[in-house]
């Protein structure tokens, strides 16, 4: 391969060009420039790169291609191009890491729930392994709908405190024609041993022989997590449905059971935010 160098009086260098248009002008239709390949140990450590004139830290604007991955949890580096600027190596590529986990049983009924703990398929003994060390945004999206409300022949409005949650159920009965019942429960997302709880509430109605149920309500919960690259974090999600005597079979069987993920599944999304 013939390489042509051009040196002008004002110190311009051209490679494969006789008319360089900058201090250094490299011309090739098939090849690129290979930056020095080094094994960095941390973003805030200059070594093994040094300034060849002083033997000290490199000057701002020094480029290298890092070949290593660290996973200390602080100032980690990953393979790619870096520039030294203000006493640290700054990555010259976008750090992007995202993963979505979804409820696996979905559709017209989703998961039918009973009183007490209900494991949610798709969130049973799962793991997430981050690509980078730093802050991740975890968004948990859940939805829940109640089962059949009971028929009631009397007119009244009552409030009942659920001992499991401290929340009040509101029940409205209007003759034998109309019954509105609030059904509730709580999602628990356990990530790496820490619980994140999301309260859920839904209304079921009975009106002159017409039933409205599985009227699901969607809610979200956002948490920011400091994670270490390459470490596998365990997580699970369950739903605890509270007993309600105004739902058929107390909500524990048959048409009184609740609904999770009707047509739209519950999901959890991890997104890398920053170092």
Predicted regions and their residues:
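Extracellular jelly-roll beta-sandwich "head" domains, especially the C-terminal globular C1q domain
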Residues: 94-275
């Amino acid at each position: 391969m013939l390489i042509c160098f051009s040196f002008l009086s004002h110190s311009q260098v051209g490679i494969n060009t006789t008319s360089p248009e900058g201090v250094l002008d490299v011309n090739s239709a098939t090849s690129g420039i290979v930056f020095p390949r080094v094994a960095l140990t941390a973003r805030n450590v200059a070594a093994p790169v040094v300034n060849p004139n002083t033997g000290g830290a490199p000057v701002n604007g020094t480029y290298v291609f890092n070949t290593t991955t660290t996973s200390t949890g602080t100032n980690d580096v990953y393979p790619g191009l870096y520039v030294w600027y203000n006493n640290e190596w700054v990555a010259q590529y976008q750090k992007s890491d995202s993963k979505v986990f979804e409820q696996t049983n979905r559709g017209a009924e989703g998961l039918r729930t009973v009183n007490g703990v209900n494991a949610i398929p798709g969130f049973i003994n799962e793991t997430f392994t981050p690509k980078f060390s730093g802050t991740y945004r975890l968004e948990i999206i859940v939805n829940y709908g109640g089962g059949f409300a009971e028929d009631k022949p009397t007119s009244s409005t009552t409030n009942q405190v659920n001992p499991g949650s401290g929340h009040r159920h509101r029940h409205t009965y209007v003759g034998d024609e109309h019954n509105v019942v609030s059904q509730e429960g709580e999602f628990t997302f356990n990530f790496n041993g820490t619980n994140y709880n999301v309260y859920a509430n839904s209304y079921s109605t009975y009106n002159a022989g017409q039933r409205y149920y599985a009227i699901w309500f969607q809610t979200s919960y956002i948490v920011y997590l400091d994670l270490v690259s390459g470490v596998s974090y365990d997580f699970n999600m369950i739903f605890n449905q509270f007993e309600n005597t105004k739902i058929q079979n107390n909500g524990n069987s048959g048409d009184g059971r609740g609904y999770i993920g009707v047509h739209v599944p519950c999901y959890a999304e991890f997104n890398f935010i920053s170092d």
